[in-house]
């Protein structure tokens, strides 16, 4: 055995063995317990970053451990390949998005293989391939038939120069990121999925996801946002009534105006005869559409001149256009109660609108100073006519009954969750399978004509989607009447692809159906791993898709992911690694210098998986030194005739040998719990390092000493093999084994080795530590007392004194009370 640790050579040999023997290829085996471990697949940006490496190392350690535990493990990998970055790169590099994407996939696949991840590459998929997105197009047509798909106009950010829709993050200071043009808010037709039809189940089923972090479940609960309230009708003379939803009907008597969005029909009608209002609406059109951006804007508005009739008092209140009301949320109209809503309060202060207090604190503890801010707490009604004196619950019931009796409102359950707009006016995405016919309307593409293939050889300049400029793509015939028709040129939101990929891994070779019976064997995913930034959108959409697929008979389970682990970020100098900060670390350079095992060991040792990991060069070097030390210790051991028959005779061991062997099996027990149950991989590694330190001090060259050392080294190599699989692959062979470690089960702690014959007890005199004794586990009380009083240092403190009482805390201490 070479005494020097040659990481690069060792890792190449191990990876060649795994590939040659297809060690990680998974197949269904009903006789074995399955374990499906999945890390969120990457966007093929070109190079792995340390966040990728951490995510995938965690998943690989879990997968390898479960394999050693006898589970039938599936760990696949693929590519979330559609999306905006490919379009941006196409503009910058003057290559088609497809070419850029496929080249990146090839490079990143090589990087993943170099890290030794135990993936079943036979199941690899890329979402930009027609044989993948064909099935989401098929699913869309089925949802269309079930009434879960519809089209309506929705607000988008429009770049008038590039003639394209911009994502919110592409709007910088109100201008398009590329053209610099002032961005407009436009209403354009968009396709939506009725995720709200599953809102109640998505909410209530969260209680059953006990393997998910509570933080993620809370984020989804808040996003779904179930609220009970009243839909109130404010009549407008000569117009349709304004429907307004409120969760605070107790404040209804304090309404002093109604706010509507700039896109509301009433606002547009008023603007036809009011040039100043028309200019204001145009100004609002140039504001980005996200809630977050609108929250930060200075509150602005204009009076429409229209009046709404208060449903209880009959008073007329003005209708204002406000820049913070979004048409895409609710009805695009909100009742304004400045005394009890801070946003309305700020708006009313700016425009001198009335502030009418109708809620007072229940007690003197709550402060209410309307000169400074709104009073937003619940309390008792004042200035509210017949409802004065009621508390919130009483007022809710009384006002609801009053409105329902008069046909001016009704109780409703509302959700913050909105239907999912899946249209994107972009090129690099899966085409939406709809044909537009002048006679028949929007018609889904028939199943036999799927997939609608995205043309990949296009010239992409970022100005309009190439699909709109390709007659050979959009010119078609109507599937229903055969007449001339136009193909939909919008593409799917990329969350569409990532909402069901986990299921396709079960049967990526099936060209006849989206998910086959193999899905029932593998699903749900047992362990899912990814960043908490995906807590709401991706994880919610995947849950929605899974329930849709269940209702279509494609899967049997109710949820896609049983357990969820959200790993922390990788930091350097206290900040998240990013190119803009110039604090990135190239995984490739790290691997080429130290080897993949060093990178894996550092990542798993530096922090628990759910916490942020601070990058440390010294930590990486320390991990490398540990592996070199392990290599040297094994090399020194095997030099002493490793092929000799070392038979461990437990009954013949002396006390020192028993003590060291107990340490070995304590480490096995701790690592098993830390890796298998607690996922505190760093503490498992720390325990293994402690065992290595004890091993270095274990100076026993007797045959039994050698046998114990062999057992200890085998345990260390097995315990480390999920974390540093390459070096362990080689060391297992050097320790005299012909079979590869990849097929060896996880070690079990020997209960007999853990059963201690003696224990150490602290001896106190009047509560102060004065010594320590070793006694037999079953030693009688008299023997323990005698040994404690005979301990030399203890004798100094009890000499000439009377022992009045002896307190023994089992397995911990003896306290001598003297006077």
Swiss-Prot record:
Can you say where in the cell this protein is located? Cytoplasm
Per the record, GO CC terms? cytosol
Reactions mediated catalytically: tRNA(Leu) + L-leucine + ATP = L-leucyl-tRNA(Leu) + AMP + diphosphate
Q: GO: which molecular function terms?
A: aminoacyl-tRNA deacylase activity; ATP binding; leucine-tRNA ligase activity
Where is the short sequence motif 'KMSKS' region located?
576-580
**Which InterPro entries does the record match to this protein?**
aa-tRNA-synth_I_CS, aa-tRNA-synth_Ia, Leu-tRNA-ligase, Leu_tRNA-synth_edit, M/V/L/I-tRNA-synth_anticd-bd, Methionyl/Leucyl_tRNA_Synth, Rossmann-like_a/b/a_fold, tRNAsynth_Ia_anticodon-bd
Q: Which UniProt keywords apply?
A: Aminoacyl-tRNA synthetase, ATP-binding, Cytoplasm, Ligase, Nucleotide-binding, Protein biosynthesis
| Motif 'HIGH' region, residue numbers | 42-52
Q: Name one GO biological process term.
A: leucyl-tRNA aminoacylation
Tell me yes or no: is Cytoplasm among this UniProt entry's keywords.
yes
- Asked whether the UniProt record includes Ligase among its keywords, one would answer yes
Q: Which residues bind ATP?
A: 579
Q: Where are the transmembrane segments?
A: none
Pfam families found in the cross-reference section: Anticodon_1, tRNA-synt_1, tRNA-synt_1_2, tRNA-synt_1g
Provide the primary localization: cytoplasm
Output the superkingdom of the source species: Bacteria
Query: What is the enzyme's class at the highest EC level?
Result: ligase
Family according to the record: Belongs to the class-I aminoacyl-tRNA synthetase family.
Name of the protein described by the UniProt record: Leucine--tRNA ligase
Q: Which organism is it from?
A: Nitrosococcus oceani (strain ATCC 19707 / BCRC 17464 / JCM 30415 / NCIMB 11848 / C-107)
